[in-house]
Each structure stands twice: as structure tokens, then as C-alpha cells.
């Protein structure tokens, strides 16, 4: 059965019977979006949350048979049939971008698609297709359960078959697609086939400033769950007016896989749901059970003085959801944080404090694997960011791998979560930009919904972003309204091209504005906070006037920082013909004549291999959360200003060092530094400085 989203039909755009060239078809038989979680059969396994240890989980990552063709009219049409011989095909690993595995070629364009522009159609002469096939085994103990097939991200559109039967279709390269394959799978050996289109109508909403890659680029796996199961849940932590106590809300939605007709309420009567909260010391601070009367349950508990989550203090609690139904017990465990993000008095507040956004834009990029980024690389990025006083990341310009958000929760990093929507190459005129074309509205809402539903429970997500460089119009009005209608936490919404007077942004978030524009906003139009979505373009010898920006930002309350463009060079490892290593960019890896934006992808604060570049040291200095000023060099009086919002400086050890001509002349400690957040104090060092021309270093 074909279940497809529909949009407004006009004669403005050419039509096609191909699903991948039809904005009326966003997905076929895809399951509804939900938060990221896994249910386990024991509490112990749920706490560890290692999917690979579940007997009801099976990874499909690894080696698949693969065939690549440069044109869609050359794709195999019967390879998905059960028993069809693909032994003569090549091999490819999953997840991977096929260009990084030797099939086709990658190219980099900052905007403009790199293909003939004729939405929603794709010119057949440049329409690569990859066909994948492999086998998998369904264990006997999965019998009687619902079997779900999960794709974390496929660029840019794909079909899937199981045992020769067509299961479904989906698009959107950066959010998950799940399918119920219970009717198609059998106990024992099964065959799965996937056909991926590099370019599709969805690609017209993915014109981001990055390498153009394709393929199954995030995890693929199967999991089995009882017929009655938790379909989704939403956590809301509503802080009181003093930001001290909180109302903890948990909304749980159950489903019954035997309810094949989605028009009726699933039969779950008699199921029991229990929730508990445990603090970092292992103390249970709340537990409650409810018996389901229908498929939706609401838990509410007033929590006194919980430890709040922020980028400075990423306090987390462990939430356990237990479902008992039909003699089976399922456990779901995840971290939650008590955090409130809101706009008040033209300021962005986190837990009541007007925090500064000391941010960067970050593409998912690996110099050896393209858009496939592993956990070690994510952790390395977060460690480097924390070491250099960066407290916020804009996921430019699409939802990142789900593990990134879990790590941001743990490490403490604010996230501006951005929908996978950019149509830069269509221009910005109202009659051209896709943001103002009603025919594309369903696609805009679909991508926004899938981001929100997946990421809604992460405390790190303090702002939703509707997209990037797509223009302005009715479709962003619709997605703005959709988020505010569905996000019970009511986080602010950020729309890059909306301007400060448009009704579909809560934050004025321009890019690359000069300092006088910031001053004018602060003086004459401070109706909402200004947070630069991109600034301090870090290409080459740059970031020179960052301190000038921050002198102004710290002067006016409605100015609250921004996100530097960008974090990491998008270079790819390559060698010359004589074996010398270099970082490839633009069209280096493509045939002559391929569209290219040259080295415009090389504008990070760090190199592609995560080596620090010189200007990140300037960022560290400007973004630092303490300021020192020598008041009296004879008496050794030092003024110390605490720029943190939630941290007392008694969390730190202070040492001082007197240097002259590069030599350390004296050094010591400054004890008993007790300075609350946003306060200034004066401290006496242990030496009288007779020569003010010699620098003093305090760390």
C-alpha cells in the first residue's frame, strides 16, 4: 500500500511518475518519527544502553554487495528479487559514502547544486544510483514480535525490499527512516536490497556548503519488539519562576503492532508503565506506576531543587521507563536534564540566565570517510571545543548523528539543532526560493518534524533552527508554527533569513553582519536577542577582529554572541601521483569540468585531521570565561571577573607566574578564590611587581 504525503498541486513545476522526482511523495510505508531509544529485557542492559548486547538487535553494518551506475536509466531493475545472483558485483562497506569507496566521484560546491537545476526533476545524464544487497538471519526468538528495519541516514533517496517484496521508500539524507518488515521477514535467512539515488527532488532541499556525497551513510540495523511497546515519549522539565524547583513531565505513547489499521487507537489496556528518576549518586528521587487506560500516559512530579543542566554544569539524571504487558517486561533508560530555554526581555535565557553563545558551526566531516563520522571523532571535537572555551554548536546545516547529541548532553554543549533544509542554489527571490513555494510545504514540515521528534528529549538542544540560506516565506511560517505547536518545552526557534521583523523567528540571527549593525540593533530595535548564526569566517589568516565583536556583545544585553564559520576544514586525504600527501578540495577528486567552489571548504578553526590552526588560540582567548586586570603592580593587586553564569571560581585552582624576557622570574598560587558567577573581585598576589613592563601570567 502506498502511503505518501501530498502537497498542493500546481502546473508551476514539471511532473514525473518517479517517486524520487515527485515532491508529492516523501516516503512510502515509513513508520512515524520518534525519539531515539532502545528497549531491553533487563534493567542492567538498559542502563548500559549498548544495543549490540540486546538479543533483539542486529546490526546490518558491514560488507554489502554493491553496483554503481552513473545514470538512473542504467540501474538494475530486478536485482531485488529473491535469489537474484549478485556474486559478480563489487563489495562496499556500510555505512559509507560510495565516492570514498571508489565508486563515482565526490565534488564540492558551496552552493548551486552542481547539477542541472530543474526541480523536482533530475537530469538523467547525471543521476548516479547505487544498488546494495546482502543477507541477514532472523533468530527463532524473534517470532511473534514486530521486526523494525532502521536506516540512520541515506543520501538522498532510497527504496528497500526484503525477500523480493517492496517494503518502502524514503528521502532526507540526515534523519532516520524506519520500516515494519514483519510481513516480509521469515525465521532464518532473508535477503535485503536497497537502491539509492544520489540526486532526487529531496536534493533540492540539501544544497548545503559541503562535499556532495551519496550512499547509506549512517547505521543500519534491525530490532524486534513485543507487539505492545513504547512507541515514543517526551520529557519536559518546567522550572518555576525562581529556577529552583521543577515539574517533571513524561508523556508516553504506547502502540500495538497488531493494530495494522492506523486509524484506530491501539489496544493496550492493562499494560503497566513505571517511571523512575535516579540522581548521579544512585539515589532514586521519584518513582510511579500507571496502568494504561488508552495508549497515552502522562506522569507528573514536582522535584525540589534538582541540579540543573547547562553547558557549564551538565548535570544529568537517569530515567528508567518500564513497560509490562502480556507477560513481557521492557526497560528503556536514558539521560535527562532539568533545563529551561526561553526568550524574556529580548534575551535568550537558559535556566534564567542570559548566557552568551560562544559558538561554532560544525559540519560532520571526516578526512578519510567523508560524511561518516565515528564516536571517537565526535569526542575529539567536543574535547577540543571545551579546551578552547566553545560552549555552543550549530549543527550546520542538518541534524547530526544521534550519538552527537548524547555526547553534548554528557560533556555540556549547547546545540542549535538545524533542519535539513537549504535551497541556496534556487536564489532568494520570492517567486523562486523554495521557502515561498506552497508545493514544497509538506517537505519542509516533514524534515522539521523528523528532526524535532528524534531530538526533542536532549537537554543540550536549546534552540531549533528551521534551516539555512533558503530565503523566506510561507513554508517557514508553517514550520515555525509546527514546532511551537508540538514542542511542550517551548524552546526558541531560529530562522536565519527571517529578519528581525518576521513572525517566524524568536531570535534575530543574521550572518556576517558588521559591528555597527549589532550596535544599531542593540540601541534601536532590541525586541529580540541578536545571535549571529555565522560570523568571523575562519578561512585563511582570519578571525582578527573577534575581540572587537565581543567588546560590543558584552556591552549590550540584547547581543548574545554567535557561531563562528566554521569548525573544521573539509579537506579529504589524498596523494599526488608521486605519493605525496595533500588535503583535497573542490574538484580535486573529480573529472575536469566538474562544478567546484575550489578551496572554499577549507575554512575551519582546525584542520581536517583535527590539528589546531593558529586562529583558534585567538578564539580561546576571546571566548575565555575569566578576565584579569592588573590594578596595582606595586602591590600586586589583580582584578578578576567571573564571566561564567553558573560556576563559582572556587571550582578552579589558580597559579601566577611572573615572566621577564621569556624567563620565569617568580611563581606561586592564589588561594581561596571564592567568586560567584558574574561577579568581580580583587585579589592580592604574593609578589610586589617593580617593573610593569614584564608580563604576569595567571592560569
Model regions: which residues?
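Single conserved hydrophobic/aromatic residue that forms the stacking wall/gate
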Residues: 687-698
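Accessory beta-strand-rich segments of carbohydrate-active enzymes
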Residues: 11-14, 21, 27, 50, ...
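Extended substrate-binding grooves/exosites of carbohydrate-active enzymes
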Residues: 5-50, 101, 115, 165, ...
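Intrinsically disordered, low-complexity Pro/Gly/Ser/Thr-rich segments with frequent PxxP/GP/PP motifs
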Residues: 287-305, 662-686
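Structural beta-strand segments of beta-rich domains
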Residues: 145-147, 246-250, 634-638
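A short beta-turn/strand-edge loop motif at beta-sheet boundaries
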Residues: 256-271, 645-652
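Short edge beta-strand/loop segments characteristic of extracellular beta-sandwich folds
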Residues: 137, 249-257, 637-645
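Core domains of carbohydrate- and sulfate-ester-processing enzymes
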Residues: 17, 61-129, 194-228, 346, ...
Amino acid at each position: 500500500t502506498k502511503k505518501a504525503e501530498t502537497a498542493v498541486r500546481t502546473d508551476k513545476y514539471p511532473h514525473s511518475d518517479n517517486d524520487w522526482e515527485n515532491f508529492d511523495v516523501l516516503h512510502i510505508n515509513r513508520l512515524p518519527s520518534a525519539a531515539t531509544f532502545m528497549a531491553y529485557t533487563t534493567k542492567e542492559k538498559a542502563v548500559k544502553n549498548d544495543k549490540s548486547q540486546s538479543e533483539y538487535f542486529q546490526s546490518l553494518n558491514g560488507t554489502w554487495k554493491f553496483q554503481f551506475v552513473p545514470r538512473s536509466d542504467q540501474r538494475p531493475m530486478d536485482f531485488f528479487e529473491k535469489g537474484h545472483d549478485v556474486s559478480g558485483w563489487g563489495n562496499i562497506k556500510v555505512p559509507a559514502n560510495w565516492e570514498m569507496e571508489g565508486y563515482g566521484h565526490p565534488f564540492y560546491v558551496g552552493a548551486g547544486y552542481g547539477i542541472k537545476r530543474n526541480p523536482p526533476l533530475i537530469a538523467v545524464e547525471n543521476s548516479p544510483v547505487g544498488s546494495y544487497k546482502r543477507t541477514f538471519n532472523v533468530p527463532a526468538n524473534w517470532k511473534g514480535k514486530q521486526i523494525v528495519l532502521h536506516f540512520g541516514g541515506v543520501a538522498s533517496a532510497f527504496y528497500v525490499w526484503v525477500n523480493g517484496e517492496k517494503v518502502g521508500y524514503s528521502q532526507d539524507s540526515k534523519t532516520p527512516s524506519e520500516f515494519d518488515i514483519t510481513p516480509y521477514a521469515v525465521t532464518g535467512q532473508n535477503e535485503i536490497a536497497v537502491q539509492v539515488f544520489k540526486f532526487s527532488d529531496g536534493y533540492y532541499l540539501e544544497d548545503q556548503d559541503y562535499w556532495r556525497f551519496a550512499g547509506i551513510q549512517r547505521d543500519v540495523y534491525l530490532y524486534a519488539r513485543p507487539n505492545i511497546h513504547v512507541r515514543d515519549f517526551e520529557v519536559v522539565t518546567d522550572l518555576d519562576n525562581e529556577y529552583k524547583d521543577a515539574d517533571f513531565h513524561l508523556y508516553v505513547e504506547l502502540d500495538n503492532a497488531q493494530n495494522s489499521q492506523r486509524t484506530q487507537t491501539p489496544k493496550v489496556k492493562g499494560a503497566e508503565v513505571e517511571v523512575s528518576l535516579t540522581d548521579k549518586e544512585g539515589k532514586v528521587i521519584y518513582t510511579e506506576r500507571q496502568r494504561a487506560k488508552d495508549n497515552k500516559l502522562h506522569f507528573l512530579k514536582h522535584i525540589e531543587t534538582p541540579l540543573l543542566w547547562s553547558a557549564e554544569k551538565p548535570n544529568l539524571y537517569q530515567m528508567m521507563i518500564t513497560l509490562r504487558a502480556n507477560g513481557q517486561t521492557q526497560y528503556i533508560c536514558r539521560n535527562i536534564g532539568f533545563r529551561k530555554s526561553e526568550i524574556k526581555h529580548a534575551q535568550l535565557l537558559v535556566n534564567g540566565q542570559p548566557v552568551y553563545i560562544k559558538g561554532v558551526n560544525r559540519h560532520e566531516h571526516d578526512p578519510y570517510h567523508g560524511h561518516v563520522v565515528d564516536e571517537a571523532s565526535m569526542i575529539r571535537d567536543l574535547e577540543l571545543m571545551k579546551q578552547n572555551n566553545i560552549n555552543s554548536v550549530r549543527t550546520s546545516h542538518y541534524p547530526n548523528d544521534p550519538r552527537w547529541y548524547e555526547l553534548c548532553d554528557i560533556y555540556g554543549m549547547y546545540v542549535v539543532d538545524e533542519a535539513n533544509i537549504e535551497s541556496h542554489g534556487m536564489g532568494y527571490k520570492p517567486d523562486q526560493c523554495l521557502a515561498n513555494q506552497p508545493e514544497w510545504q509538506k517537505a519542509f514540515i516533514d524534515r522539521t518534524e523528523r528532526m524535532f521528534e528524534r531530538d526533542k528529549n536532549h537537554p543540550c538542544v536549546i534552540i531549533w533552527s528551521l534551516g539555512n540560506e533558503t530565503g523566506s516565506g510561507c513554508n517557514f511560517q508553517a514550520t515555525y508554527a509546527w514546532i511551537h505547536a508540538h514542542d511542550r518545552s517551548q524552546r526558541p526557534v531560529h530562522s536565519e533569513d527571517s529578519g528581525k521583523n518576521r513572525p517566524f523567528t524568536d531570535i534575530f540571527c543574521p550572518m556576517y553582519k558588521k559591528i555597527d549593525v549589532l550596535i544599531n540593533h542593540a540601541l534601536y530595535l532590541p525586541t529580540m536577542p541578536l545571535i549571529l548564526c555565522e560570523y568571523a569566517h575562519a578561512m585563511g589568516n582570519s578571525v582578527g577582529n573577534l575581540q572587537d565583536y565581543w567588546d560590543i556583545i558584552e556591552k549590550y544585553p540584547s547581543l548574545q554572541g554567535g557561531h563562528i564559520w566554521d569548525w573544521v576544514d573539509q579537506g579529504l586525504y589524498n596523494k599526488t601521483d608521486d605519493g605525496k600527501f595533500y588535503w583535497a578540495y573542490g574538484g580535486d577528486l573529480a573529472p575536469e569540468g566538474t562544478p567546484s567552489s575550489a578551496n572554499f571548504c577549507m575554512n575551519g578553526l582546525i584542520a581536517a585531521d583535527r590539528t589546531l590552526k593558529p586562529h583558534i588560540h585567538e578564539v580561546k582567548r576571546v571566548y575565555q570565561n575569566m578576565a584579569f586586570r592588573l590594578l596595582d603592580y606595586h602591590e600586586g593587586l589583580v582584578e578578576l571577573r567571573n564571566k561564567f553564569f553558573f560556576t563559582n571560581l572556587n571550582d578552579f585552582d589558580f597559579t601566577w607566574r611572573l615572566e621577564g624576557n621569556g624567563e620565569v622570574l617568580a611563581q606561586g598560587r592564589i588561594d581561596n578564590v571564592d567568586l560567584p558567577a558574574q561577579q568581580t573581585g580583587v585579589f592580592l598576589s604574593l609578589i610586589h611587581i617593580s617593573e610593569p613592563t614584564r608580563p604576569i601570567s595567571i592560569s
